[in-house]
């Protein structure tokens, strides 16, 4: 995972929101970023020299708050030297399929366009 993070140009964090947070499985994988945190704040080194852009995609079955999950995902992107280009949050997926949400589909297209044109 770490070698991919260092090589890629863009990173998209995608997760369902459970109990107002990204999934435990995503957090378990991303806990490997502790090495980046230590490099930056303890050893005073740049852990991922290649700057990149990123984005966050969050889904939720209900209409609960998204702030905690979004904050966690944004913090993880920063640890990977990503400048976030935005978040797409889709809620009520238990009631309305994403394919029926033209507003969300447009937000995703807009975010994809920003990723495509980012340097």
What are these regions (language model features)?
Residues 74-119:
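Glycine-rich phosphate/pyrophosphate-binding loop and the adjoining helix
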Residues 1-78:
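Helix-loop-strand module that forms the ligand-binding subsite of alpha/beta enzymes
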